[in-house]
Every structure is written in C-alpha cells, then in structure tokens.
Amino acid sequence: MFSFITDRGWKAVWTAVTLASFAVMFALNFLLGSPGGLVWWSMIKIFLLALQFGGITAYLFRKNLKKALVSFWITVLCLGLLSLIAPVLAPFAKVVMNTEDTSFEMATPLFLLFTGVTASWLIPGPKGRMAVRILWAVFVLLYCLIQFTYIGYFGLTHALISVNMMLALAQTNLHEALEYISVNIPLLNLVLAVAALFALSYIIFLVSGYFFVGPRDVSGRTKKGIVLILIFEVAALIFCFSQTRIAQTVAQTQDTVKSFIEYQHMVEERRHNVINNKHLSNKLKHAPDGVYVLIIGESETRDHMGVYGYPRDNTPFETEAAENKDYTFFTHAYSSYTQTVQSLTYALTQKNQYNKIPLVDAYSIIDMARAAGFRTTWISNQSRFGIWDTPIGAIGSACDDQHWMNDYIGTGVQTKDYDSILVPQLQKVDPNNRRQLIVIHLMGSHVSYWDRYPHAGFYKYPLDQSKTRSKDQVMIDEYDNSVLYTDHVLSEIMNVAINHLHADEVMYFSDHGELVTQNPGHNADQFEFQMVHIPFWIYTSPEYQKKHPAEFAAMKRRKNWLFTNDMAYDTLMGSMGLTSVKYDPTCDFFSRKYDKDITNMMTMYGNIWLRKDVKALGTNYKNQ
C-alpha cells in the first residue's frame, strides 16, 4: 500500500492531508477562538498552512522517507500543541481571543517549521543544512520559551502575559527578579521547567535531522519556485508573529515606556523654563508662605496597619498620632494603580483618572512650587536611574536640592540602607526658609520584606517564634515587621518636621498597596482591592489650622470619604494656596467644589469602580 502511494498516489495524499489538516485546524480555531476578527483571513492562513503541510507530507511519502515522515508529523504535533497554549488559557484568564487572534497563534510555529524545511532544500551539502537546522532550532527554543512562560505566568497569576506584566518587568531588574523568583517559584519547579524547555527543544532539533532534506538535484526552475515559496513563508512568519499576543503586548509596552520617556524629556525641558515663566510666576507668587512635607510610602496597604484596625499593633506611632487632633487619618484612600510609576506619575502631576490632560503636558507639583518661589527638596531611598524610574526620577530631578540615597544605577529596589538614612538629610534642610516643599520617598515595604527593616528591634512577629509557620504566615510576619519599621521612620521624620522645620503641613500616602500572601505582590493582572488600599493621613500645625479653618474643618468632616491618590496634586496645590492656575478644585479633597463620590470614583486608571469594593465599603456607602 505504501509503495502504491509513493509511486502513483502522492497527489491524492497531498489532497487528503491538506483537507484533513485544514478541517482539524478549522475546528480548533472555531472551538478556541471567540467570534470576531476577519474570519475569511483566518481561513486563508489555515488553508495555506494545510496546503504546505500536505505538500511536504506527500513529498516524504513519494520519496519513501518513513523516518522523515514520522519525525515531521511529530514535530508538527509538538509545535501545534504549543501554539494552542495561549488560546486554551485565555478563557480561564478572562481574556478574549477571537478566531483571527487564534489563527495567528496557530500559524506562527508552523510557518517557522515550514520556513526551516524549505530553506534546507535550497542549501547544498550537509554542513549548510546543519547550519540551517541550528539556526532554526534557536528560533524554536525561543518560541518554546515564550510558551513555557505563558504556562508559568498563568500558574502564578491565573492571567496571560499582558502589558501590566511587561511594565512591571520594565520596572524590575536582575536583583528584584531574583527576589521574585526566590519568593514565588520553588527551586525544583524552576529547574524542572528549564530542563523540560531544553529537552523539548533538543528533541525537536534531533528529529528535524530526518526531514531537513530535499531534492539532491534541483533544476533552476524548481529552485526559483522554492525561493519564491521561502520568501512567502518568511513574510508570513514575520507577519503572523507580529500579530500574536506576545508581540502585540511587547509593542504596546514599548509605546507606554516611550510615553514615559517622552514625559521625562518634557520634564527636563520644563525644569529649565518654569522658573522663567512669568505667566506662571505672576499667577502663583501671591500664594502664602509655608513649609510643606510630602512623604510617599512604598507598597504599604492599610489592611496590614494597626491604626486602620488590623489586629496587630505594628503602627504604635501612627496609632497614637490618630488620637492627636493635629493629625487626620482618612479611612478610604485608594491608589490609582498597583504599580509605582503609573501611580506616582498621576499623584505628582496634573494628570489623573478624571481628566483628559496628556501626561506629557501635565505640570508636576514640583514645577508649580518652584514657579511660586518655593524651595524644593527631594529626598529618596529609591533608585534615580533606569527605564522604570525615569518619570519619577525626572520629577525629582526638577527640585532645587536632591538627595538620592540609593546610588545603585538601574537597580530599582536594591538598596544598602534602610529608610532611616533619609532622616539626617531632612535635618539638613534650612528651617529659616519659610517657603519650602520637601518630598520624601521611602523604600517602605517593597519585597523582599525582610530586607526592608533592621532585625534588631523590629523583628517583632511572630510573637511566638517557636511555632512552625506556613509560608503565608511567614510572608505576613515579615511584611508586618516592615510596616512596624516604616512606622518608626515616620515617627522620626515627624519629629524633625514638627520640631526642627516647624512644618505647616505634612501629607503621607503610599504609592500603592500590597497583596500579602505566600506569593505576595501588586500585579495588576491579579488585581485585588488590597493592592490599592493605601494609608493616607495629614498633619497640620496649630498655626495652619488657625489660618485655614475651613480646610481644617473639611479634613475632619471628610475623613471617611473616598480618595484616590491621583488627586494628591490638586489637594496639595490647594493646601499650599497655589489655586490660580493649573489647579482643579473638583479634585482637591478639601475644596468646596470637590465632586467625587462613590458614583464616579475609580482605580486602575479608570478601569475599576471603587463601588465594587463591597468588602471595604459595603453596599450602601455614601460620603458622610
């Protein structure tokens, strides 16, 4: 039977295999893809794949290359199954992939395979074909790596690779990546995954040796035809890969990072011009004097703070401060996003979830304070440099005085010093200058939590250190200890702010919260409201309270109102009296014109309504 097929029926084989494989791919595309997209275009891609699959199969039949045929089919099966990973996981990750999306995922590895096979037909001699195989195997390895990453990321987060994940990666470095791996991925699992990746790639490379063969003697006309086929396959491969989810995600991430970099350049240009901007200066110069301190926490969720009702006493200073009438603690504060750069670029600028101002056109609180004649100081324990820090670093770099205590270039959350190192820098600020804005950026509770506090004096939890703890509990204990240390640092900062600088107002909030579990973090793809639950409190001096009784009364009256930290810019502008330009009173938390409530307040850049946080707010919450 086989000899009959090879001798006389190879055309029938080509037709049968083409139709059968087309039917299988069509069915898979229909089952896994949601309605939508250009269905006819999807069908054309699938048919061309089936046609090539049938053609190569028929050729191997005709030449009686049984091992090559079996190896080829095994390779097609392996790559085909890998191509289904994203479409299969998509519904579980609540991601919609239509039939066109699914067809691009299915087509990419098969066009990669057919490109390699066709190229080998054009290269004479075993050495040339081996070179083609090796190059092809490298691309297969990279493709397998992408698919394994899909599986691993889904296993950790129950989500597909997304722009959120890529932006988090862009804000990550080798040190932080190793920390994340050590916390979230057991070493054995990681070793097995890497071994499986290389084993699969190596097996595909080995079996490809059987079918990376072609006609020994190819006529000029045939060779031209093969060249045209190869050109088509390369073009199809590039196009199909560019439309896959991973490629689209990378492209969107690049656009976002590009916008951050553009913002950085805009801030740097504005830094040189804002002081000489007579329009701004004339509008703002009448603002009253005052010393204002803004403290920005890191990864601190109010759900793990004793002052907000958490059962552990890990905020002794803040708990005591909450009883002092000079402090106002706000119970329902949220961050605008779950990641630092996204959150703080909104918190420190005009841009917020409730307006349409492009980020590149948004003035920062530093710009406005400097234009009004305030001396500005930036004191930070976070990295200044690196792609992930450029927007925040650019804002801080506009200050008159800068103290960047984290001198690791591009290392994000790696620091050799605890946050208490910032206090001596604050003590150096001249208290005689009564027109100042000082921003302090803490390292706070960023993972790994155990690196954020000195164990001497702050390793309080667990209270009973003889008991065996679950991995969840270990993380909770370490996080709570870091919160305890942040509370201590805040007490030191407030001591200097009140007794040395005689500050008129001190505002504290965290950039975002944290989900504290065995696998902790603030990944937007795993969104839970705890990731955006943040502490927010304000200290006002008795003198400030006398000068601004209406604002002080509004603070006390609104302590249970909803607030998102992207309104910090307008709120601080209002407190400083910078209300004549680049100011929106509807986003000033203490303004009479403040118009935000549960009906219109959001988080995650306007994608999630706060009213969905039923666990924290209940079903009948109102500003009262």
Predicted feature locations:
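Transmembrane and membrane-interface helices of multi-pass
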Residues: 1-250
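Membrane-interface soluble catalytic domains
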Residues: 2-53, 59-76, 94-97, 102, ...
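A long, amphipathic alpha-helix that forms part
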Residues: 117, 423-428, 464-506, 538, ...
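Active-site-proximal alpha/beta segments of enzymes that process anionic O-linked groups
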Residues: 228-466, 564-595
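Active-site metal-binding loops of divalent metal-dependent hydrolases
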Residues: 299, 511-512
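Short, solvent-exposed loop/turn segments at the edges of secondary structure
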Residues: 341-342, 531-533
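Flexible glycine/proline-enriched surface loops and loop-helix/loop-strand junctions
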Residues: 349-350, 408-411, 474-475, 550-556
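SF2 helicase/translocase ATPase core recognition
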Residues: 534-540
